[in-house]
Swiss-Prot record:
Gene: purM
GO-annotated biological processes: 'de novo' IMP biosynthetic process; adenine biosynthetic process
Chemical reaction(s) catalysed: 2-formamido-N(1)-(5-O-phospho-beta-D-ribosyl)acetamidine + ATP = 5-amino-1-(5-phospho-beta-D-ribosyl)imidazole + ADP + phosphate + H(+)
Localization, UniProt: Cytoplasm
UniProt-recorded name of the protein: Phosphoribosylformylglycinamidine cyclo-ligase
InterPro entries (UniProt xref): PurM-like_C_dom (IPR010918), PurM-like_C_sf (IPR036676), PurM-like_N (IPR016188), PurM-like_N_sf (IPR036921), PurM_cligase (IPR004733)
Keywords for this protein: ATP-binding, Cytoplasm, Ligase, Nucleotide-binding, Purine biosynthesis
GO MF annotation list: ATP binding; phosphoribosylamine-glycine ligase activity; phosphoribosylformylglycinamidine cyclo-ligase activity
Gene3D superfamilies linked: PurM-like C-terminal domain (3.90.650.10), PurM-like, N-terminal domain (3.30.1330.10)
Pfam families membership: AIRS, AIRS_C
Main localization, broad class: cytoplasm
Classification of source organism: Bacteria, Pseudomonadati, Pseudomonadota, Gammaproteobacteria, Moraxellales
Family note: Belongs to the AIR synthase family.
Enzyme class: ligase
UniProt EC number: 6.3.3.1
């Protein structure tokens, strides 16, 4: 026999027992998000889900996303309870753009050293996001990778699948001149632009871990970490009230802001004319712009600037759409209109 010590996986930095403990902690989280279509529970090699009844020609819609360097701020502030909501929101809001109903969600959690309490807190947030989206958390992967990440660092990715009736897919091809753009308010910076947010914090000299500064009636920490708003229920209410045919286009305002995201869903011959007087920057965005001396054009192409989602509807449907969205709990307003395109796809006036 060799005199060398017998090595275990734990000696290499991977604690299987911690992983098992996490699974036990989060089983109830996943169960609380279940839908009737889900077959089985956590722990299998693959998760099963039926397509909901009532669809004639269903199309599956998939998406994946993360939360960027907002994670670095979460780690700095030791706030892990809402970052999971961010993860779900980034995925499900993308699926909404084509008119899809989110069905199920999976997450990937990678870390240098698994902290079961932190991971369970994150997954609890994912579960909360899934409940807000009527979306089942049906599986995921937790990877402990010593040497790949610093001990406490972790990264997240989310994966979502939804369903839409083929005849009701929203493509943007029906957008016409004179259509109205309706804005849905964001809850803050959502999950985009946080590398610039962190740079602004650095140059401002503000210690965000201890600052008592208030923005928008809340602590600067709460303002910076406010979870991304989930628009699933509001868009469902709009579809039920107006019908999908009245929703000519939708856009989730993420990285790239209004400037880069609106053109993704608009015809090449039309431009979105944005009425910049229709809303005011929140104190958060004003603080970021002032502390970072950021040009207005850079604000519009980096942050959502208070507009988290945009819907394009016929002019005669605008008032009904705003009322429906308001009744669903959203702050909604007329953001602008579609005009003939001369140069830029988005025009600020």
């Amino acid at each position: 026999m060799s005199n060398k010590p017998s090595l275990s996986y734990k000696d290499a930095g991977v604690d299987i027992d911690a992983g098992d403990a996490l699974v036990q902690r989060i089983k109830s989280v996943a169960k609380a998000t279940s839908r009737p279509e889900v077959v089985g529970g956590l722990g299998g090699f693959g998760a099963l889900c039926r397509i909901p009844t009532g669809y004639t020609s269903p199309l599956l819609v998939s998406g994946t996303d993360g939360v960027g360097t907002k994670l670095k701020l979460a780690l700095q502030l030791n706030r892990h309870d809402t970052i999971g909501i961010d993860l779900v929101a980034m995925c499900v809001n993308d699926l909404l753009v084509c008119g899809a109903e989110p069905l199920f969600f999976l997450d990937y959690y990678a870390t240098g050293k698994l902290d079961v309490d932190v991971a369970a807190t994150v997954v609890t947030g994912i579960g909360e996001g899934c409940k807000l989206s009527n979306c089942a958390l049906i599986g995921g992967e937790t990877a402990e990778m010593p040497g790949m990440y610093q001990d406490d660092d972790y990264d997240l990715a989310g994966f979502c699948v939804g369903v839409v009736e083929e005849a009701e897919v929203i493509t943007g091809e029906n957008v016409t001149e004179g259509d109205v753009l309706i804005a849905l308010a964001s809850s803050g910076a959502h999950s985009n632009g946080y590398s610039l947010v962190r740079k602004v914090i650095e140059v401002s000299g503000v210690d965000v871990t201890s600052s008592n500064e208030q923005l928008d009636g809340q602590s600067i920490q709460d303002a910076l970490m406010a979870p991304t708003r989930i628009y699933v229920k509001a868009i469902k209410a709009l579809q039920d009230t107006l019908g999908s045919s009245a929703l000519h286009a939708m856009s989730h305002i993420t990285g790239g802001g209004l400037t880069d995201n609106l053109p993704r869903v608009l015809p090449d011959h039309l431009a979105a004319s944005i009425d910049t007087s229709s809303w005011q920057f929140s104190e958060l965005f004003t603080w970021l712009q002032t502390q970072g001396n950021i040009e207005q054009s850079e604000m519009y192409r980096t942050f959502n600037c208070g507009v988290g989602f945009v819907i394009v509807v016929p002019k005669d449907k605008a008032d009904a759409a705003i009322k429906t969205l308001t009744d669903a709990g959203e702050k909604a307003w007329k953001l602008g209109e579609m005009v003939s395109r001369e140069a830029d796809a988005v025009v600020y006036r």
